[in-house]
């Protein structure tokens, strides 16, 4: 047994022991520490496999298992799980103190993380599906343990309903592939009719796409993530949706090959929709965690753009371009895992101190919580794609891959690549717009309520993880080639050219980017501005003049005011609603209440009609529950007759 295999086994055992210790009286902090250490060891094992480019354990089998193993792709996702989950579990040591059901939440969190590990190391359909279901149920348990409010229960109900939808597709695809022997014989599926391959591809896209949060199957995500404890939100958004993408990568690039021709265009269309619509809906949100959840939809769309571009480039015979697009998708998978978990953890710290995440009630937190605020600023720059942070590197590579696809991808690739590149460019601009708003409302400006003014920095166990994640975002952004090298070997189309992996990222025929030089330039400009400001001296303070009114935080920019121009321009798409209620005392206006919202059109036009139809059908089916023994015996006899008839037809 190899060293990496031993490290993986020891890590899983230590994490399991940590789950048990978490529920022991006064064992919460020790249990979470053991969980974090064990998960970190599994990540080390995954990194060893990626660097060594050699798998350990079993290969995928068509049997009923259980079998486990790690190849470089699994190793990459193991390392990513550890980089997100270890800081989240350390953060939970401070976050869960004083909360109700803290030991049970800690145990559910540990089970959740181990289920993520289990999915990526599973090497048979049954083990994969068992871990998949455990991964789906564990966060729901943690959410309900943290809160039993009506909104939380409704969010969990939507999440579990979407999980069932995803499960149907995943179970159908996995069990059918095992039945056909496609896990061991990669040519077995090629002999099947096109209809069978199309049905399996559709099941995989629906199943894994729903769990990943691709539009239009994303409705659970902006409900469940804000309802979860912040360390669970960090792992859900940081890694659970990425594990769904892991399953999609296995399906599209390995098990279902060769794919039907419609798969790549459909995936690219869903990805472009997720990018643009995700960031638009994020801009319209007033609650921080819900805003971050919609940005998860956006970034999953960016990853899916890279995967779709890889498929289209491979179909056009451009294998080097396909390798670049695949590597860009994997790099953004890692980058989003880091900066999104960072942002959710910072949001949890803000909520712990202030008691709300309403953007219009925050402000000035950079002064009262400087460490968390600085880390949040770093995460905001990363998710907005601002250099020198990691989000820019992967988005730049994805954009270059799409531009190259538009130039060299053949008739289909040219049109689709151009549309996708335009969608990504628009998404990047809107993301910057969104986080200018977020940073201004959350970190800067005056305190909007007394709780913000009285807030202070959280404990070391909560600041340490966010500083660590912010450092990773900066490090990968400055030297992305160090990470891109091992990631490049994950591509099924061969490694990236060596010229693309140095200090300067080079895309042959497209462009180059020197992140270290950009970082040095930004640092130099910052120092120069500080020196110039110091030499200029400070301005004399003067009272604010606002036409005789007393200065008040309500006069500052609001979340809705910041995006009003965009709402007006896109009103035909967003369909904003506004109500104004005026309370009169005789002829004197006593109060004016203004309410506005941007409805979620996917819910109103797609899911609510489906739900209403299902409920109507359920009411009809309830009529069969008559309470009559004779009726139930009749149902049994009819069912038995149908089964026997089907069996008879099958035998003949």
Description of each model-found segment:
Residues 17-22, 89-90, 438, 523-533, ...:
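Alpha-helical transmembrane segments
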Residues 58-62, 187-188, 397-411, 482-507:
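Membrane-interfacial helical/loop segments at transmembrane boundaries in membrane proteins
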Residues 483-513, 531-652:
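Aromatic-capped, Gly/Pro-kinked transmembrane alpha-helices
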Residues 87-98, 103, 107-128, 138-458, ...:
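Hydrophobic transmembrane alpha-helices and their helix-loop junctions in integral membrane proteins
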Residues 70-82, 197-208, 412-428, 502-524:
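Hydrophobic alpha-helical transmembrane segments
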Residues 36-48, 166-172, 376-388, 465-484, ...:
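Hydrophobic alpha-helical membrane-insertion segments
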Residues 1-10, 16-107, 182-191, 484, ...:
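Transmembrane helix-loop-helix hairpins at membrane boundaries of multipass inner-membrane proteins
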């Amino acid at each position: 047994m190899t060293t990496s295999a031993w490290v993986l086994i020891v890590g899983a055992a230590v994490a399991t022991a940590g789950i048990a210790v978490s529920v022991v009286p006064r064992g919460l902090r020790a249990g979470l520490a053991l969980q974090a250490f064990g998960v970190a060891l599994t990540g080390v094992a995954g990194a060893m496999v990626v660097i060594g480019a050699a798998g350990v354990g079993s290969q995928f089998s068509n049997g009923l298992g259980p079998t486990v193993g790690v190849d470089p792709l699994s190793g990459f996702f193991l390392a990513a799980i550890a980089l997100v989950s270890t800081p989240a579990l350390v953060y939970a040591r401070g976050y869960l103190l004083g909360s109700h059901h803290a030991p049970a939440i800690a145990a559910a969190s540990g089970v959740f993380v181990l289920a993520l590990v289990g999915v990526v190391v599973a090497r048979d359909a049954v083990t994969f599906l068992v871990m998949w279901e455990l991964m789906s149920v564990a966060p729901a348990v943690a959410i309900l343990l943290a809160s039993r409010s009506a909104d939380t229960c409704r969010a969990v109900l939507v999440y579990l309903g979407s999980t069932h939808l995803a499960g149907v597709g995943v179970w159908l695809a996995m069990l059918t592939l095992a039945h056909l022997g496609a896990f061991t014989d990669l040519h077995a599926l090629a002999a099947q009719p096109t209809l069978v391959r199309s049905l399996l591809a559709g099941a995989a896209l629906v199943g894994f796409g729903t769990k990943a949060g691709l539009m239009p199957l994303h409705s659970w995500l902006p409900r469940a993530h804000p309802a979860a404890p912040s360390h669970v939100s960090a792992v859900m958004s940081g890694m659970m949706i990425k594990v769904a993408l892991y399953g999609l990568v296995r399906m599209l690039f390995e098990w279902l090959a060769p794919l039907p021709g419609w798969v790549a265009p459909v995936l690219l269309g869903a990805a472009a929709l997720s990018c643009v619509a995700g960031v638009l809906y994020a801009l319209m949100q007033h609650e921080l965690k819900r805003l971050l959840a919609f940005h998860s939809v956006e970034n999953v769309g960016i990853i899916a753009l890279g995967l779709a571009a890889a498929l289209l480039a491979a179909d056009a015979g451009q294998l080097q371009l396909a390798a670049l697009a695949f590597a860009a998708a994997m790099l953004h998978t890692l980058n989003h895992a880091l900066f999104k978990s960072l942002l959710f953890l910072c949001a949890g710290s803000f909520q712990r101190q202030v008691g709300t995440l309403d953007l219009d009630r925050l402000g000035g937190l950079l002064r009262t919580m400087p460490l968390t605020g600085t880390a949040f600023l770093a995460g905001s720059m990363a998710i907005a794609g601002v250099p020198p942070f990691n989000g820019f590197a992967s988005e730049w590579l994805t954009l270059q891959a799409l531009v190259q696809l538009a130039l060299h991808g053949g008739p289909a690739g040219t049109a689709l690549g151009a549309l996708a590149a335009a969608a990504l460019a628009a998404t990047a601009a809107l993301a910057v717009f969104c986080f200018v708003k977020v940073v201004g409302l959350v970190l800067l400006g005056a305190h909007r309520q007394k709780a913000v003014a009285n807030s202070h920095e959280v404990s070391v166990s909560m600041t340490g993880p966010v500083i660590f994640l912010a450092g990773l975002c900066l490090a990968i952004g400055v030297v992305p080639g160090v990470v891109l090298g091992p990631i490049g070997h994950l591509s099924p189309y061969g490694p990236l050219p060596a010229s693309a992996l140095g200090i300067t990222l080079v895309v042959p025929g497209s462009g180059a980017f020197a992140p270290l030089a950009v970082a040095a330039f930004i640092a130099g400009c910052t120092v120069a501005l500080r020196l110039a400001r110091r030499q200029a001296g400070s301005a004399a303070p003067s009272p604010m003049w606002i036409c005789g009114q007393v200065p008040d935080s309500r006069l500052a920019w609001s979340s809705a005011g910041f995006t009003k121009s965009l709402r007006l321009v896109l009103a035909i798409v967003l369909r904003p609603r506004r109500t104004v209620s005026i309370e009169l005392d005789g002829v004197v206006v006593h109060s004016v209440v203004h309410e506005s919202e941007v409805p979620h059109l996917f819910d109103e036009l797609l899911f609510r009609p489906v739900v209403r139809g299902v409920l109507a059908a359920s009411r009809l089916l309830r009529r069969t529950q008559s309470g009559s023994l004779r009726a139930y015996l009749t149902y049994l006899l009819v069912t038995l007759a149908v089964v026997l008839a089907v069996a008879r037809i099958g035998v003949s």
